[in-house]
Amino acid sequence: MQPIISVSNVSKTYASGLRALERVNLDIRRGEIFALLGPNGAGKTTLISIICGIVTLTEGTVSVAGYDIGRDYRVTRSMIGLVPQELTTDAFETVWATVSFSRGLFGKPRNPDYVAKVLKELSLWDRKDSKIMTLSGGMKRRVLIAKALSHEPQILFLDEPTAGVDVELRKDMWDIVRALRAEGVTIILTTHYIEEAEEMADRIGVMHGGKIILVEDKAELMHKLGKKQLTLHLQKRLDALPDALAAHRLTLAADGNEIIYTYDTQGERTGITALLKDLNLAGIRFRDLHTTQSSLEDIFVGLVRQRQ
């Protein structure tokens, strides 16, 4: 299947000489939720801005549903909705007016029924006649999503969609994103909340230093790069680990009351059997144990550190 977005060898150098992107290649599949992760300055917003036609690329090509973003600008832009990171809204306009106006900017005919549908799905219907300046930060962000959806785009970019939003509203946003995907909208999000990507994304892309350093299915990424930890809760506190256990690369934690063993989930052998045998020989007894899996945040931090 042809990707809905194809980025090929894209580079961007600003007038100041800053090289923001370096030969980026990326394909986005139709109907997926794709999370683009990376530290500040990695190039995420620049890449999104290029695809959306806001920033001009220096080298390379970008196509949307087979249309070139430069040659077929109006066609590609009409397929894309963008929710920016900043809360840029018309403070003195009503919710209804600003969403309807956004639809008109893309040359779409008036469609009150569709605008009403969007506002209801985003829980904005009761505030449709309210001036935007009277809304909370979370509601203003919903208005931005409504504006981005006003012209019925096939693709929705969410740049830090839950920045400054409380936990309850963040989970509401997650539900909104899932519902949009269920309707066939392709969604690309950038986020500093790694749990957000872990919760929603089908695939993960990681950027660092203006480059894409990894693109992987989320489940496969966590399987390949994730590690597990075995935590042993000791019967008696230890001041230090015996030299006989040095080969296991253990960590003494919880003020000497826990031993933590980290192992690779891809290894043929975990080493747990040998560890338990050596603990027994060393006279170390434990009262309980449990295992934990690396989170996406652990994997992301590890990938970025490798590049530093």
What are these language model-derived features?
Residues S100, G104-R127:
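Conserved ABC ATPase "signature" region
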Residues W174-D264:
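ABC transporter nucleotide-binding domain
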Residues E152:
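Conserved catalytic motifs of ABC-family nucleotide-binding domains
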